[in-house]
């Protein structure tokens, strides 16, 4: 998968986007830039469901890079590289 970043969607995100995964070409992108490219590639706007009013990750949003939570690093400024595997979980709803 040289030159590509695999992005897998889980939970409500997968249902909303109607796809389990996409691949993005890129290297050295921040997570925020990657999310914007995902919106372009899927043709759907979803960032407002993942980010708070201060453009930080909403509580309950989980983004893993190769199994590591981005919250433990630089958050949305975390850089990804070709070959990385990204897992994206939107906040769950219910009641």
Mark where each language-model region is.
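Ubiquitin-like/PB1-type beta-grasp interaction modules and other compact soluble beta-rich domains
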Residues: 1-94
């Amino acid at each position: 998968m040289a030159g590509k970043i695999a992005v897998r969607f889980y939970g409500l995100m997968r249902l909303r986007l109607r796809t389990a995964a996409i691949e993005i070409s890129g290297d050295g992108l921040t997570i925020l830039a990657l999310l914007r490219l995902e919106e372009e590639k899927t043709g759907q706007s979803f960032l407002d469901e993942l980010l708070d009013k201060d453009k930080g990750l909403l509580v309950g949003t989980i983004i893993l890079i190769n199994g590591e939570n981005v919250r433990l690093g630089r958050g949305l400024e975390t850089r990804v590289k070709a070959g990385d595997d990204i897992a994206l979980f939107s906040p769950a709803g219910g009641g």
